[in-house]
């Protein structure tokens, strides 16, 4: 059986699992893991086929979620960034008893643009898939550059993301393609209407991949959830605004503890 790479840090009284985005790995959290591990028992995970979780091919969203769950604590706050937000959401839908709260970061339940739904144009995602076959390192770098565009620290943030990618062997092309296929096809807008645990959605005002127009639409569709927009962030608010980001998670932890004690 293939193993998921998993690292646990800290001894907080609430578990927090962090799931990274497409093309990346758990090293992306190093900018905040020290701070978070002083408040939580922190779980850093490389998604199947990414980073140190080798030996996996392209997986469906459901299979990716099940693979990650195998090594997870019984109960935790699940936080997913971008593609990781879909994985965390899938776990909240299929195993709600194991999710104390769901946090999605710069993530959309439907990344692909649809009728009356803002998102990434399907032909752009298909283009990325095609380009992966031609020059996959350059394609990944282009995708990373898109994630930080427009912020005051764009160049520095893009360098941080690139360093994360290059720190470990690149994922296989079929794994990257599989991740893009999930972004292109999955739509969890309706299913997530039914989750009952605390649900926090974090966005960057300048995000070029998850348009801010989706925020009020999802506020209306999911009135039980809360949203927060980082005014000067793009697709990676935890890199550009680490202090503010951690503060929101610590505040969520306090709410989760109140709920679990009542």
Swiss-Prot record:
The active site is at residues 82, 207, 235. The keyword Protein biosynthesis does not apply. It is an enzyme of class 3 (hydrolase). GO terms for biological process: biotin biosynthetic process. It comes from the Bacteria. Residues 15-242 form the AB hydrolase-1 domain. It holds the Pfam family Abhydrolase_1. Its EC number is 3.1.1.85. It catalyses: 6-carboxyhexanoyl-[ACP] methyl ester + H2O = 6-carboxyhexanoyl-[ACP] + methanol + H(+). It is found in: Cytoplasm. Pathway: Cofactor biosynthesis; biotin biosynthesis. The keyword Hydrolase applies. Keywords: Biotin biosynthesis, Cytoplasm, Hydrolase, Serine esterase. The physiological role of BioH is to remove the methyl group introduced by BioC when the pimeloyl moiety is complete. It allows to synthesize pimeloyl-ACP via the fatty acid synthetic pathway through the hydrolysis of the ester bonds of pimeloyl-ACP esters. Monomer. This is Pimeloyl-[acyl-carrier protein] methyl ester esterase. It comes from Shigella flexneri.
């Amino acid at each position: 059986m293939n193993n998921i790479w998993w690292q646990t840090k800290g001894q907080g009284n609430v578990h927090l699992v962090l799931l990274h985005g497409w093309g990346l790995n758990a090293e992306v959290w190093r900018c905040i893991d020290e701070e978070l591990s002083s408040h939580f028992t922190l779980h850093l995970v490389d998604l199947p086929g990414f980073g140190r979780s080798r030996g996996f091919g392209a997986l469906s969203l459901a299979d990716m979620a099940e693979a990650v769950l195998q090594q997870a604590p019984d109960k935790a706050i699940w936080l997913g960034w971008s593609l990781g937000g879909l994985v965390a959401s899938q776990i909240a839908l299929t195993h709600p008893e194991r999710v104390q709260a769901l946090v999605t970061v710069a993530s959309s339940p439907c990344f692909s643009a649809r009728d009356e739904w803002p998102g990434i144009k399907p032909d752009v995602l298909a283009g990325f898939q095609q380009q992966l076959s031609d020059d996959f390192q350059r394609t990944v770098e282009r995708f990373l550059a898109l994630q930080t565009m427009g912020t005051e620290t764009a160049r520095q943030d893009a360098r941080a993301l690139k360093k994360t990618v290059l720190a470990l062997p690149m994922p296989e092309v079929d794994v990257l393609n599989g991740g893009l296929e999930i972004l292109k096809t999955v739509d969890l807008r309706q299913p997530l209407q039914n989750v009952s645990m605390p649900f926090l959605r974090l966005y960057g005002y300048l995000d070029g991949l998850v348009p801010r127009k989706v925020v009020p639409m999802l506020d209306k569709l999911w009135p039980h959830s809360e949203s927060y927009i980082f005014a000067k962030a793009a697709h990676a608010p935890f890199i550009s605004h680490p202090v503010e980001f951690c503060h929101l998670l610590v505040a969520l932890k306090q709410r989760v503890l109140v709920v679990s004690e009542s």
